Amino acid sequence: MNAAPITQDLLTIPRKLPETAGRNLVGLTREQLHEALIQAGTPERQARMRVGQIWQWIYHWGVRDFAQMTNLAKDYRALLAENFEIALPEIVTRQISADGTRKYLLRISGGHEVETVYIPEENRGTLCISSQVGCTLTCSFCHTGTQKLVRNLTAGEIVGQVMVARDDLGEWPKPGAPKDETRLVSNVVLMGMGEPLYNFDNVRDAMKVVMDGEGISLSRRRITLSTSGIVPEIAKTAEEIGCLLAVSFHATTDETRDKLVPVNRKWNIETLLNALREYPRLSNSERITFEYVMLDGVNDSDEDARRLVRLIRGIPAKVNLIPFNEWPGSPYRRSGWERIEAFADIVHKAGYASPIRTPRGEDIMAACGQLKSATERGRKTAAQIAAEARA
Protein backbone atom coordinates (compact mmCIF):
# COMPACT_ATOMS: atom_id res chain seq x y z
CA MET A 1 0.00 0.00 0.00
CA ASN A 2 1.52 3.34 -1.03
CA ALA A 3 1.42 5.89 1.75
CA ALA A 4 -0.08 9.20 0.66
CA PRO A 5 1.38 12.47 1.92
CA ILE A 6 0.04 13.70 5.25
CA THR A 7 -1.89 16.95 5.19
CA GLN A 8 -2.03 19.29 8.17
CA ASP A 9 -5.36 20.20 9.74
CA LEU A 10 -6.90 21.50 12.92
CA LEU A 11 -7.40 18.17 14.69
CA THR A 12 -5.14 17.32 17.60
CA ILE A 13 -5.52 13.55 17.22
CA PRO A 14 -2.26 11.95 15.95
CA ARG A 15 -2.39 12.15 12.18
CA LYS A 16 -0.81 8.90 11.13
CA LEU A 17 -1.72 5.33 11.91
CA PRO A 18 1.22 3.20 13.08
CA GLU A 19 2.98 1.43 10.24
CA THR A 20 3.22 -2.34 10.44
CA ALA A 21 5.36 -4.76 8.49
CA GLY A 22 2.59 -7.28 7.78
CA ARG A 23 0.45 -7.23 4.66
CA ASN A 24 -3.18 -6.42 5.37
CA LEU A 25 -5.46 -9.33 4.47
CA VAL A 26 -8.63 -7.20 4.43
CA GLY A 27 -9.75 -6.56 0.87
CA LEU A 28 -7.74 -9.31 -0.80
CA THR A 29 -9.79 -11.43 -3.16
CA ARG A 30 -9.68 -15.20 -2.68
CA GLU A 31 -7.15 -15.46 -5.50
CA GLN A 32 -4.94 -12.75 -3.97
CA LEU A 33 -5.19 -14.33 -0.52
CA HIS A 34 -4.26 -17.73 -1.96
CA GLU A 35 -1.15 -16.25 -3.57
CA ALA A 36 -0.19 -14.32 -0.43
CA LEU A 37 -0.41 -17.43 1.76
CA ILE A 38 1.81 -19.43 -0.57
CA GLN A 39 4.38 -16.62 -0.66
CA ALA A 40 4.39 -16.62 3.16
CA GLY A 41 5.23 -20.32 3.28
CA THR A 42 1.87 -22.13 3.21
CA PRO A 43 2.27 -25.42 1.30
CA GLU A 44 0.50 -25.09 -2.03
CA ARG A 45 -1.60 -28.22 -1.43
CA GLN A 46 -2.99 -26.66 1.77
CA ALA A 47 -3.45 -23.10 0.54
CA ARG A 48 -6.99 -23.49 -0.83
CA MET A 49 -8.25 -24.95 2.45
CA ARG A 50 -6.47 -22.24 4.46
CA VAL A 51 -8.08 -19.52 2.33
CA GLY A 52 -11.53 -20.86 3.21
CA GLN A 53 -10.73 -21.06 6.92
CA ILE A 54 -9.17 -17.59 7.18
CA TRP A 55 -11.91 -16.08 5.02
CA GLN A 56 -14.62 -17.27 7.38
CA TRP A 57 -12.78 -16.04 10.45
CA ILE A 58 -12.32 -12.54 9.01
CA TYR A 59 -15.55 -12.00 7.10
CA HIS A 60 -18.10 -14.26 8.81
CA TRP A 61 -17.00 -14.02 12.45
CA GLY A 62 -15.28 -10.64 12.30
CA VAL A 63 -12.11 -11.89 14.02
CA ARG A 64 -9.08 -9.55 14.05
CA ASP A 65 -6.57 -11.68 15.95
CA PHE A 66 -4.97 -14.72 14.34
CA ALA A 67 -4.70 -16.29 17.80
CA GLN A 68 -8.51 -16.63 17.84
CA MET A 69 -8.55 -18.76 14.68
CA THR A 70 -8.81 -21.92 16.71
CA ASN A 71 -9.19 -24.41 13.85
CA LEU A 72 -5.66 -23.50 12.71
CA ALA A 73 -2.56 -25.02 14.31
CA LYS A 74 -0.71 -22.73 16.74
CA ASP A 75 2.45 -22.67 14.65
CA TYR A 76 0.44 -21.71 11.56
CA ARG A 77 -1.30 -18.93 13.49
CA ALA A 78 2.15 -17.67 14.47
CA LEU A 79 3.23 -17.71 10.82
CA LEU A 80 0.17 -15.65 9.89
CA ALA A 81 0.79 -13.14 12.68
CA GLU A 82 4.41 -12.76 11.58
CA ASN A 83 3.52 -12.03 7.96
CA PHE A 84 0.09 -10.42 7.97
CA GLU A 85 -2.34 -8.16 9.78
CA ILE A 86 -6.11 -7.67 9.83
CA ALA A 87 -6.40 -3.90 9.84
CA LEU A 88 -9.42 -1.62 9.47
CA PRO A 89 -9.85 2.13 9.19
CA GLU A 90 -9.84 3.88 12.56
CA ILE A 91 -12.95 5.68 13.80
CA VAL A 92 -11.96 9.28 14.55
CA THR A 93 -15.49 10.48 15.30
CA ARG A 94 -18.95 8.97 15.28
CA GLN A 95 -21.96 11.26 15.15
CA ILE A 96 -25.54 10.08 15.63
CA SER A 97 -28.33 12.16 14.14
CA ALA A 98 -31.70 12.78 15.75
CA ASP A 99 -33.16 10.37 13.15
CA GLY A 100 -30.68 7.60 14.05
CA THR A 101 -28.34 8.13 11.11
CA ARG A 102 -24.71 7.50 12.03
CA LYS A 103 -21.80 9.28 10.38
CA TYR A 104 -18.29 7.93 10.84
CA LEU A 105 -15.15 9.91 10.15
CA LEU A 106 -12.56 7.24 9.41
CA ARG A 107 -8.79 7.56 9.27
CA ILE A 108 -6.95 5.48 6.69
CA SER A 109 -3.32 4.95 5.72
CA GLY A 110 -1.30 8.13 5.39
CA GLY A 111 -3.49 9.99 7.87
CA HIS A 112 -6.23 10.75 5.34
CA GLU A 113 -9.89 10.67 6.27
CA VAL A 114 -13.14 9.61 4.62
CA GLU A 115 -16.75 9.57 5.74
CA THR A 116 -19.17 6.65 5.90
CA VAL A 117 -22.87 6.93 6.75
CA TYR A 118 -25.26 4.33 8.17
CA ILE A 119 -28.96 4.98 7.60
CA PRO A 120 -31.35 2.79 9.62
CA GLU A 121 -34.84 2.22 8.28
CA GLU A 122 -37.80 0.17 9.45
CA ASN A 123 -37.00 -2.96 7.46
CA ARG A 124 -33.40 -2.44 6.38
CA GLY A 125 -30.17 -0.59 7.08
CA THR A 126 -28.19 1.10 4.33
CA LEU A 127 -24.48 1.84 4.54
CA CYS A 128 -23.20 4.61 2.28
CA ILE A 129 -19.49 4.09 1.64
CA SER A 130 -16.75 6.13 -0.02
CA SER A 131 -14.40 5.09 -2.83
CA GLN A 132 -11.95 8.01 -2.94
CA VAL A 133 -10.45 10.65 -0.66
CA GLY A 134 -11.99 13.73 -2.23
CA CYS A 135 -13.29 13.72 -5.79
CA THR A 136 -12.21 14.82 -9.27
CA LEU A 137 -15.66 15.64 -10.61
CA THR A 138 -16.33 19.10 -9.08
CA CYS A 139 -20.11 18.74 -9.35
CA SER A 140 -21.22 22.24 -8.42
CA PHE A 141 -24.03 21.20 -6.04
CA CYS A 142 -22.00 18.61 -4.11
CA HIS A 143 -19.96 19.40 -1.00
CA THR A 144 -17.54 16.54 -1.66
CA GLY A 145 -16.81 18.11 -5.04
CA THR A 146 -15.18 21.08 -3.31
CA GLN A 147 -12.51 18.75 -1.88
CA LYS A 148 -9.85 17.91 -4.43
CA LEU A 149 -8.96 14.30 -5.07
CA VAL A 150 -6.15 13.04 -2.84
CA ARG A 151 -6.11 9.37 -3.80
CA ASN A 152 -8.17 6.28 -4.49
CA LEU A 153 -9.13 4.02 -1.61
CA THR A 154 -7.69 0.52 -1.62
CA ALA A 155 -10.01 -2.47 -1.76
CA GLY A 156 -9.21 -3.06 1.92
CA GLU A 157 -10.22 0.48 2.85
CA ILE A 158 -13.52 0.06 1.00
CA VAL A 159 -14.32 -3.31 2.60
CA GLY A 160 -13.05 -1.91 5.90
CA GLN A 161 -15.87 0.64 5.98
CA VAL A 162 -18.42 -2.18 5.96
CA MET A 163 -16.55 -4.03 8.69
CA VAL A 164 -16.19 -0.94 10.89
CA ALA A 165 -19.93 -0.34 10.69
CA ARG A 166 -20.66 -3.96 11.59
CA ASP A 167 -18.28 -3.61 14.54
CA ASP A 168 -20.05 -0.50 15.77
CA LEU A 169 -23.49 -2.05 15.34
CA GLY A 170 -22.47 -5.35 16.97
CA GLU A 171 -23.54 -7.33 13.92
CA TRP A 172 -20.95 -10.12 13.82
CA PRO A 173 -22.44 -13.50 14.83
CA LYS A 174 -21.40 -15.08 18.11
CA PRO A 175 -20.16 -18.70 18.05
CA GLY A 176 -22.79 -20.99 19.55
CA ALA A 177 -25.54 -18.35 19.50
CA PRO A 178 -28.79 -18.99 17.58
CA LYS A 179 -28.58 -17.79 13.98
CA ASP A 180 -30.10 -14.34 13.59
CA GLU A 181 -31.35 -13.56 10.08
CA THR A 182 -31.84 -9.87 10.88
CA ARG A 183 -29.25 -7.74 9.11
CA LEU A 184 -28.53 -4.26 10.40
CA VAL A 185 -26.35 -3.57 7.36
CA SER A 186 -28.59 -5.07 4.69
CA ASN A 187 -27.69 -2.76 1.80
CA VAL A 188 -24.52 -1.03 0.64
CA VAL A 189 -24.51 1.99 -1.63
CA LEU A 190 -21.36 3.38 -3.22
CA MET A 191 -22.62 6.94 -2.93
CA GLY A 192 -20.12 8.44 -0.50
CA MET A 193 -17.02 10.45 -1.32
CA GLY A 194 -15.56 9.94 -4.79
CA GLU A 195 -16.52 8.51 -8.18
CA PRO A 196 -16.45 4.69 -7.91
CA LEU A 197 -15.82 4.14 -11.61
CA TYR A 198 -12.61 6.18 -11.44
CA ASN A 199 -11.41 3.53 -8.96
CA PHE A 200 -12.88 0.57 -10.78
CA ASP A 201 -10.42 -2.23 -9.97
CA ASN A 202 -10.40 -1.61 -6.22
CA VAL A 203 -14.19 -1.17 -6.10
CA ARG A 204 -14.68 -4.40 -8.06
CA ASP A 205 -12.35 -6.38 -5.78
CA ALA A 206 -13.96 -4.92 -2.66
CA MET A 207 -17.44 -5.85 -3.87
CA LYS A 208 -16.26 -9.40 -4.64
CA VAL A 209 -15.27 -9.69 -0.99
CA VAL A 210 -18.52 -8.17 0.28
CA MET A 211 -20.66 -10.42 -1.96
CA ASP A 212 -18.83 -13.67 -1.16
CA GLY A 213 -21.33 -16.15 0.29
CA GLU A 214 -18.97 -17.46 2.99
CA GLY A 215 -18.34 -14.07 4.55
CA ILE A 216 -20.29 -10.81 4.65
CA SER A 217 -22.53 -12.35 2.00
CA LEU A 218 -24.43 -9.40 0.59
CA SER A 219 -26.38 -10.15 -2.58
CA ARG A 220 -25.43 -8.08 -5.62
CA ARG A 221 -29.06 -6.94 -5.59
CA ARG A 222 -28.31 -5.33 -2.22
CA ILE A 223 -25.43 -3.27 -3.60
CA THR A 224 -25.91 -0.08 -5.61
CA LEU A 225 -23.08 1.71 -7.34
CA SER A 226 -23.68 5.36 -8.11
CA THR A 227 -21.81 7.00 -10.98
CA SER A 228 -21.86 10.44 -12.53
CA GLY A 229 -21.60 8.81 -15.94
CA ILE A 230 -18.13 7.39 -16.63
CA VAL A 231 -19.33 5.75 -19.83
CA PRO A 232 -16.36 3.47 -20.67
CA GLU A 233 -16.67 1.69 -17.30
CA ILE A 234 -20.44 1.11 -17.32
CA ALA A 235 -20.42 -2.13 -19.33
CA LYS A 236 -17.47 -3.41 -17.24
CA THR A 237 -19.49 -2.72 -14.09
CA ALA A 238 -22.32 -4.87 -15.42
CA GLU A 239 -20.04 -7.72 -16.45
CA GLU A 240 -17.52 -7.75 -13.58
CA ILE A 241 -19.62 -6.61 -10.60
CA GLY A 242 -23.24 -7.01 -11.69
CA CYS A 243 -24.68 -4.83 -8.93
CA LEU A 244 -27.51 -2.34 -9.25
CA LEU A 245 -26.65 0.96 -10.92
CA ALA A 246 -27.64 4.49 -10.02
CA VAL A 247 -26.75 7.48 -12.19
CA SER A 248 -26.31 11.03 -10.95
CA PHE A 249 -28.35 12.56 -13.77
CA HIS A 250 -29.61 15.87 -12.35
CA ALA A 251 -30.40 17.71 -15.59
CA THR A 252 -32.25 17.21 -18.86
CA THR A 253 -30.14 19.38 -21.18
CA ASP A 254 -26.43 19.25 -21.87
CA GLU A 255 -26.17 22.97 -21.16
CA THR A 256 -27.42 22.56 -17.58
CA ARG A 257 -25.72 19.22 -16.95
CA ASP A 258 -22.38 20.63 -18.12
CA LYS A 259 -22.60 23.08 -15.22
CA LEU A 260 -23.95 20.70 -12.58
CA VAL A 261 -21.98 17.58 -13.55
CA PRO A 262 -18.94 18.71 -15.57
CA VAL A 263 -18.04 15.17 -16.69
CA ASN A 264 -21.01 15.62 -19.05
CA ARG A 265 -18.69 17.66 -21.27
CA LYS A 266 -16.79 14.43 -21.93
CA TRP A 267 -19.72 12.01 -22.10
CA ASN A 268 -22.91 13.91 -22.84
CA ILE A 269 -26.48 12.89 -22.10
CA GLU A 270 -26.98 11.02 -25.38
CA THR A 271 -23.75 9.04 -24.98
CA LEU A 272 -24.58 8.22 -21.36
CA LEU A 273 -28.11 7.07 -22.15
CA ASN A 274 -26.87 4.80 -24.95
CA ALA A 275 -24.60 3.05 -22.44
CA LEU A 276 -27.37 2.83 -19.84
CA ARG A 277 -29.77 1.14 -22.26
CA GLU A 278 -27.41 -1.84 -22.36
CA TYR A 279 -26.84 -2.15 -18.61
CA PRO A 280 -29.96 -4.12 -17.57
CA ARG A 281 -29.26 -6.74 -20.23
CA LEU A 282 -25.58 -7.11 -19.34
CA SER A 283 -26.13 -7.28 -15.57
CA ASN A 284 -29.60 -8.86 -15.32
CA SER A 285 -30.65 -5.81 -13.33
CA GLU A 286 -34.32 -5.02 -13.20
CA ARG A 287 -33.88 -1.28 -13.58
CA ILE A 288 -31.55 1.68 -13.31
CA THR A 289 -32.04 4.43 -10.74
CA PHE A 290 -31.80 7.98 -12.04
CA GLU A 291 -30.84 10.35 -9.23
CA TYR A 292 -32.11 13.88 -9.66
CA VAL A 293 -31.30 16.62 -7.16
CA MET A 294 -34.00 19.29 -7.00
CA LEU A 295 -32.47 22.77 -7.35
CA ASP A 296 -34.72 25.78 -7.15
CA GLY A 297 -35.08 27.45 -10.55
CA VAL A 298 -32.29 25.39 -12.11
CA ASN A 299 -33.65 21.97 -13.12
CA ASP A 300 -37.08 21.68 -11.48
CA SER A 301 -39.60 22.95 -14.04
CA ASP A 302 -42.51 20.99 -15.48
CA GLU A 303 -40.70 21.06 -18.83
CA ASP A 304 -37.65 19.48 -17.17
CA ALA A 305 -39.86 16.69 -15.84
CA ARG A 306 -41.45 16.05 -19.23
CA ARG A 307 -38.06 16.14 -20.95
CA LEU A 308 -36.66 13.67 -18.40
CA VAL A 309 -39.45 11.23 -19.18
CA ARG A 310 -38.74 11.50 -22.90
CA LEU A 311 -35.02 10.95 -22.41
CA ILE A 312 -35.31 7.77 -20.34
CA ARG A 313 -38.15 6.23 -22.36
CA GLY A 314 -37.36 2.59 -23.08
CA ILE A 315 -35.00 2.19 -20.12
CA PRO A 316 -36.30 0.15 -17.15
CA ALA A 317 -35.90 2.86 -14.53
CA LYS A 318 -37.02 4.67 -11.45
CA VAL A 319 -36.31 8.32 -10.67
CA ASN A 320 -35.13 9.24 -7.18
CA LEU A 321 -35.90 12.89 -6.52
CA ILE A 322 -33.46 14.32 -3.98
CA PRO A 323 -34.31 17.54 -2.15
CA PHE A 324 -31.07 19.52 -2.23
CA ASN A 325 -29.18 19.37 1.05
CA GLU A 326 -27.58 22.74 1.64
CA TRP A 327 -24.02 23.16 2.88
CA PRO A 328 -21.95 26.21 3.87
CA GLY A 329 -21.23 28.35 0.82
CA SER A 330 -23.51 26.41 -1.51
CA PRO A 331 -24.66 28.46 -4.54
CA TYR A 332 -28.01 26.62 -4.77
CA ARG A 333 -31.27 26.40 -2.85
CA ARG A 334 -33.64 23.47 -2.40
CA SER A 335 -36.75 23.46 -4.57
CA GLY A 336 -39.99 24.11 -2.71
CA TRP A 337 -41.90 21.05 -1.59
CA GLU A 338 -44.89 21.76 -3.86
CA ARG A 339 -42.53 22.09 -6.84
CA ILE A 340 -40.86 18.77 -5.99
CA GLU A 341 -44.23 17.03 -5.69
CA ALA A 342 -45.43 18.49 -9.00
CA PHE A 343 -42.26 17.24 -10.71
CA ALA A 344 -42.70 13.80 -9.14
CA ASP A 345 -46.32 13.67 -10.28
CA ILE A 346 -45.39 14.25 -13.93
CA VAL A 347 -42.76 11.50 -13.82
CA HIS A 348 -45.11 9.11 -12.03
CA LYS A 349 -47.95 9.66 -14.50
CA ALA A 350 -45.53 8.75 -17.30
CA GLY A 351 -45.13 5.31 -15.71
CA TYR A 352 -41.96 5.69 -13.65
CA ALA A 353 -41.66 5.34 -9.89
CA SER A 354 -40.60 8.75 -8.60
CA PRO A 355 -40.02 8.57 -4.83
CA ILE A 356 -38.91 11.73 -3.07
CA ARG A 357 -35.95 10.90 -0.87
CA THR A 358 -36.42 11.88 2.75
CA PRO A 359 -33.32 13.81 3.82
CA ARG A 360 -31.49 11.88 6.55
CA GLY A 361 -28.74 13.07 8.87
CA GLU A 362 -28.90 16.74 7.84
CA ASP A 363 -28.14 17.86 11.39
CA ILE A 364 -24.75 16.10 11.25
CA MET A 365 -23.98 16.95 7.58
CA ALA A 366 -24.51 13.30 6.60
CA ALA A 367 -27.18 13.81 3.95
CA CYS A 368 -26.71 13.27 0.22
CA GLY A 369 -24.16 15.71 -1.22
CA GLN A 370 -22.94 16.91 2.18
CA LEU A 371 -20.06 14.50 2.83
CA LYS A 372 -16.61 15.98 3.17
CA SER A 373 -13.79 15.12 5.52
CA ALA A 374 -13.77 17.17 8.69
CA THR A 375 -10.15 18.14 8.15
CA GLU A 376 -11.04 19.83 4.89
CA ARG A 377 -14.05 21.56 6.44
CA GLY A 378 -11.83 22.93 9.18
CA ARG A 379 -9.27 24.19 6.72
CA LYS A 380 -11.56 26.45 4.68
CA THR A 381 -13.93 29.22 5.59
CA ALA A 382 -17.45 29.40 4.20
CA ALA A 383 -16.34 32.34 2.05
CA GLN A 384 -13.55 30.27 0.51
CA ILE A 385 -15.95 27.43 -0.25
CA ALA A 386 -18.44 29.83 -1.82
CA ALA A 387 -15.71 31.38 -3.98
CA GLU A 388 -14.64 27.93 -5.21
CA ALA A 389 -18.23 26.99 -6.00
CA ARG A 390 -18.67 30.14 -8.11
CA ALA A 391 -15.42 29.61 -9.99
UniProtKB/Swiss-Prot annotation:
Disulfide bonds join 128-368. Binds 1 [4Fe-4S] cluster. The cluster is coordinated with 3 cysteines and an exchangeable S-adenosyl-L-methionine. Residues 121-363 form the Radical SAM core domain. Keywords: 4Fe-4S, Cytoplasm, Disulfide bond, Iron, Iron-sulfur, Metal-binding, Methyltransferase, rRNA processing, S-adenosyl-L-methionine, Transferase, tRNA processing. One of its GO terms (molecular function) is metal ion binding. The keyword Iron applies. S-adenosyl-L-methionine binds at residues 194-195, 226, 248-250, 325. Its cofactor is [4Fe-4S] cluster. [4Fe-4S] cluster binds at residues 135, 139, 142. It catalyses: adenosine(2503) in 23S rRNA + 2 reduced [2Fe-2S]-[ferredoxin] + 2 S-adenosyl-L-methionine = 2-methyladenosine(2503) in 23S rRNA + 5'-deoxyadenosine + L-methionine + 2 oxidized [2Fe-2S]-[ferredoxin] + S-adenosyl-L-homocysteine; adenosine(37) in tRNA + 2 reduced [2Fe-2S]-[ferredoxin] + 2 S-adenosyl-L-methionine = 2-methyladenosine(37) in tRNA + 5'-deoxyadenosine + L-methionine + 2 oxidized [2Fe-2S]-[ferredoxin] + S-adenosyl-L-homocysteine. Its main location: cytoplasm. It is found in: Cytoplasm. The active site is at residues 115, 368. It holds the Pfam family Radical_SAM. GO terms for cellular component: cytoplasm. CDD domains: Radical_SAM. Its EC number is 2.1.1.192. HAMAP family: RNA_methyltr_RlmN. PANTHER family: 23S RRNA METHYLTRANSFERASE (PTHR30544), RADICAL SAM CORE DOMAIN-CONTAINING PROTEIN (PTHR30544:SF5). Reaction proceeds by a ping-pong mechanism involving intermediate methylation of a conserved cysteine residue. Specifically methylates position 2 of adenine 2503 in 23S rRNA and position 2 of adenine 37 in tRNAs. m2A2503 modification seems to play a crucial role in the proofreading step occurring at the peptidyl transferase center and thus would serve to optimize ribosomal fidelity. Belongs to the radical SAM superfamily. RlmN family. NCBIfam families: rRNA_mod_RlmN. This is Dual-specificity RNA methyltransferase RlmN. It comes from Paracoccus denitrificans (strain Pd 1222).
